[in-house]
Amino acid sequence: MKVLLIKDVKSLGKAGEIKEVKDGYGQNFLINKGLAKLATPDVVENWKAEQARQEKELKEEIERFEAEKKMLEAHTIRIEKQSAPVGIKGSVGNADISAAIKEQLDIDLDKKHINLKKALKSTGIHEVDAKLGHGIHATLKVEVVGV
């Protein structure tokens, strides 16, 4: 019997491959555990269409991240804090930067994706790294201004 592997099977092959297996192994183990499907022409065609759709979505997502990276690197994020005799009162953290990006550039960037070694406690322009996804990083310029 021919089966289309849905998931990687250590001793058999990788997902997407069509393999010839014994009927009992294919029916009782692979298909029953959801590791494979019977390789009919319809199933193979649907699998290829699904893979093409997922690849297209991934490409679009990467393009979106690249566009966001260009926008983030082209702009300086301005954050206003109450000034103190030295620096500012309080500090600027990941959540503040994330909220400022949403407000100023309308880009949703989770605070967990902003790599800030320690909170910003002084005025001026600071460079901050942000992970957008799929290995794409942006270097943000954050300007902290005392008001």
Swiss-Prot record:
Q: Which domain of life is it from?
A: Bacteria
Q: Does the keyword Ribonucleoprotein apply?
A: yes
What's a Pfam family in this record? Ribosomal_L9_N
Q: Which GO terms are recorded in the biological process aspect for this UniProt protein?
A: translation
Cited InterPro entries: Ribosomal_bL9, Ribosomal_bL9/RNase_H1_N, Ribosomal_bL9_bac/chp, Ribosomal_bL9_C, Ribosomal_bL9_C_sf, Ribosomal_bL9_N, Ribosomal_bL9_N_sf
Q: Which GO terms describe its cellular component?
A: ribonucleoprotein complex; ribosome
User: Which Gene3D superfamilies does the entry mention?
Assistant: Ribosomal protein L9, C-terminal domain, Ribosomal protein L9, N-terminal domain
Q: Kindly list the GO molecular function terms attached to this UniProt entry.
A: rRNA binding; structural constituent of ribosome
What function is annotated for this protein?
Answer: Binds to the 23S rRNA.
Family membership:
Belongs to the bacterial ribosomal protein bL9 family.
What is this protein's record name?
Large ribosomal subunit protein bL9
Organism equals Sulfurovum sp. (strain NBC37-1)
Upper lineage: Bacteria, Pseudomonadati, Campylobacterota, Epsilonproteobacteria, Campylobacterales
Q: Which gene encodes it?
A: rplI
